[in-house]
Amino acid sequence: MVEDILAPGLRVVFCGINPGLSSAEKGFPFAHPANRFWKVIHQAGFTDRQLKPQEAQLLLDYRCGVTKLVDRPTVQANEVTKLELHAGGRKLIEKIEDYQPQALAILGKQAYEQGFSQRGTQWGKQTHTIGATQIWVLPNPSGLSRVSLEKLVEAYRELDQSLVMRGL
C-alpha cells in the first residue's frame, strides 16, 4: 500500500493516477526506477536535491505532498477503469478541501478528464479550482510516457514559478 503524504498548508500536492506494482511492493510513491518524478521535481525547483522514493516523507519539508486518484495498483495506468477514476476524483476533492494546498497538480490529462468529467484539457493551470486551490494538469512522469525529460521539467517548473510569483 502506498500512503498519501499530505499535511495542511502545502504549496502543492502532486496527484498520480495509481500506484504501479513496484510502488505498491516497496510502499513508496513513484518507486519504479524508470519513473522520472523525483528527477523532474528536483530539476523543476521543488526540492534542493533529488530525493529517493524511500525519502518521500521528506517532501513535506519542501511543502509538497503526494496522493493518487486510485488506490489499486496495476502494471500500467491504462488498466484503471473510468469508473475508478471518477470515484477517485470525488475522493480527491474531499482530500483537497480538507488540506487546502495552494495547488493540486494532476499528473496526466486523461486522469484529469475522467476523474473530473472534463473535456479538451490543455496542459498547465486550469480554470476551475477546488476552493482556493488551483488545479494544474501536468504530463505524467512515468517511464512509459513519451514526453521528454526536458518537456516534463519545463511543465513542472511553470507551476513552481507560478507559486514563487505568488510568494509561496
Swiss-Prot record:
Gene3D superfamilies registered for this protein in UniProt: Uracil-DNA glycosylase-like domain
Function noted in UniProt: Excises ethenocytosine and uracil, which can arise by alkylation or deamination of cytosine, respectively, from the corresponding mispairs with guanine in ds-DNA. It is capable of hydrolyzing the carbon-nitrogen bond between the sugar-phosphate backbone of the DNA and the mispaired base. The complementary strand guanine functions in substrate recognition. Required for DNA damage lesion repair in stationary-phase cells.
EC number: 3.2.2.28
Keywords for the protein's UniProt record, in alphabetical order: Cytoplasm, DNA damage, DNA excision, DNA repair, DNA-binding, Hydrolase
Listed name of the protein: G/U mismatch-specific DNA glycosylase
Coiled coil: none
Gene: mug
Primary location recorded for the protein, binned into one broad class: cytoplasm
Keyword DNA damage carried by entry: yes
Main EC class the enzyme belongs to: hydrolase
Highest taxon, organism lineage: Bacteria
Record InterPro entries: MUG/TDG, MUG_bact, Uracil-DNA_glycosylase-like, Uracil-DNA_glycosylase-like_sf
GO cellular component term of the entry, any: cytoplasm
Intracellular or extracellular location(s): Cytoplasm
Keyword Cytoplasm: yes
The organism of origin for this protein: Escherichia fergusonii (strain ATCC 35469 / DSM 13698 / CCUG 18766 / IAM 14443 / JCM 21226 / LMG 7866 / NBRC 102419 / NCTC 12128 / CDC 0568-73)
Catalyses which reaction(s): Specifically hydrolyzes mismatched double-stranded DNA and polynucleotides, releasing free uracil
GO biological process terms held by the UniProt record: base-excision repair, AP site formation
Oligomeric form and interacting partners: Binds DNA as a monomer.
